[in-house]
Amino acid sequence: MRHCLPVLLFVLALLRPDMAAARVVQIATGELPPYATESRADKGVALQIVRRAFALAGHEVRFHFMPWSRAQLETKAGLWDASAYWGASDQRRRDFLLSDTVLVEQWQLVSLREIKLDWQRLEDLGSWRIGVIRDYTYTPEFWRLVQAGRLQTDNTTDDLAGLRKLLLRRIDVLPIERNVACDLLARHFSPAEAAQLAIHPRLLTDSFTTHLLLPPQLPRSQVLLQDFNRGLRQLISSGEHARIMTSVSCPLGWAPRPAAQDPAATGPRQTP
């Protein structure tokens, strides 16, 4: 037995790198500051949540940045262990295993502070010019009202252009994800410009949930999904998830963030 021990230790030493590599989760992702970005040390709010959830389950994570469409296609083909982070859709539920909710995006209405925007229902916005990004889903009700002519919209290329239109008074209201707005204002506008804008505390919808996608054909996908969901539950129950979600600074004087919601309790988002 004494002679077998050195051989056993040698074999274990050879196996250890492969065993460690098997615990590393390779994740395809893209740029969407502040949620997913190479410009932040933590790689963004959403990716930090993904990293910490896997870490609590004993996995190391490596993120690989690429165009979003490529990330989804290559993950579907099984070239990556997972892709983060994505909205739910019927097609993605057919193509992938979807995790529990990573985070609920906070879509709110930004306006010039001087107009003192108040609203209870979308119909209340009928007298304002609303900036919209054509490729965004928003909500089915929102688009029904637009098609019925009950909301006035102005097409714009992206969120940054929408914020600039607000300051130029070319639009009155911009639906935008709260943390995306905060990040853009911090990086592209002066404090004086940001101070001209207000955000209404009411959420446009509470169902913009986002998820980790895993290819169902890979042998370990089901185990990784279970491990991730377990780690995510720990992250939420410990309060760390909520702390990560508040890591983006917003302009002074903005309305308080909406009350935290249980990410597992909301419905699906339709777009990434």
Language model regions located:
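Ligand-binding clefts/hinges and TM-proximal coupling segments of bilobed small-molecule sensing domains
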Residues: 137-151, 193, 229-272
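Short loop->beta-strand "edge-of-pocket" segments that line small-molecule binding or catalytic clefts
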Residues: 24-38, 121-138, 233
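Extracytoplasmic small-molecule ligand-binding "clamshell" domains
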Residues: 22-95, 238, 247-251
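Extended ligand-binding regions for polar small-molecule ligands
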Residues: 47-56, 210-244
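Acidic, polar ligand-binding/catalytic clefts
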Residues: 51, 64-124, 135-138, 201-205
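Short helices/loops that flank or line small-molecule/ion binding pockets
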Residues: 69-80, 97, 160-183, 187
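Ligand-binding cleft/hinge of the Venus flytrap
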Residues: 48-59, 100-101, 124-126, 135-157, ...
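Periplasmic-binding protein-like
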Residues: 29-31, 104-108, 191-229, 251-259
